[in-house]
A protein has these predicted regions:
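Iron-sulfur-associated redox domains of electron-transfer enzymes in respiratory
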Residues: 1-182
Length: 182
């Protein structure tokens, strides 16, 4: 049997979900025999590949680059898992939305001018610094998501439960203690 092509993506978040994924410990060795990791922050691949079987997406959609890669992922991936609370709800990155939709300039002003200790200036470099969206979004607001794995971060046992089911061609049944936020 050919290994499934798996990707992990890190959008607007803290990388805690990827750290929790690494907490799979010995199961990572088993997983390595079942999958081919084709795209991830932990490997050096620059372009998201075609024909990906499963992608775990960590983080909220905060900027134009996040939105662009997300549409590419959906077009090239069979199963998308919204991985962690930021991807599922927007969570911490969406705190800036409390200032109101469209207040991106106020957020940048506060972060880079008012609270700067050295060289106060808003970073602007076309093609280098992506344009922030007017509002932070969870993944499912931009593309269809097949499965949701909440948690901040989801613990390794929940990640394993989901991966075993998805890789086995089954629909994950996350319920009870397997389905909780925070």
């Amino acid at each position: 049997m050919e290994p499934l092509k798996v990707a992990t993506v890190w959008l607007g978040g803290c990388a805690g979900c990827h750290m929790s994924f690494l907490d799979l410990d010995e199961f990572l060795i088993d997983l390595a025999g079942m999958i081919e990791l084709v795209y991830s922050p932990v490997i050096d691949v620059k372009e998201y590949p075609h024909n990906v079987d499963v992608c775990l997406i960590e983080g909220a959609i905060c900027n134009e680059d996040n939105l662009e890669i997300l549409h590419k992922i959906r077009a090239r991936t069979k199963v998308i898992v919204s991985f962690g609370d930021c991807a599922v709800t927007g969570n911490v990155p969406a705190i800036r939305d409390q200032l109101g939709a469209g207040n991106v300039e106020n957020v940048l002003q506060c972060a880079y001018i008012e609270n700067a200790q050295n060289n106060p200036s808003v970073p602007k470099a076309d093609g280098i610094v992506p344009q922030l969206l007017k509002r932070v979004m969870p993944v499912h607001e931009a593309v269809h998501v097949d499965y949701f794995l909440p948690g901040c971060p989801p613990p390794a046992d929940r990640i394993k439960a989901l991966m075993v089911q998805v890789l086995g061609g089954k629909t994950p049944k996350l319920e009870g203690t397997q389905l909780k936020f925070g």
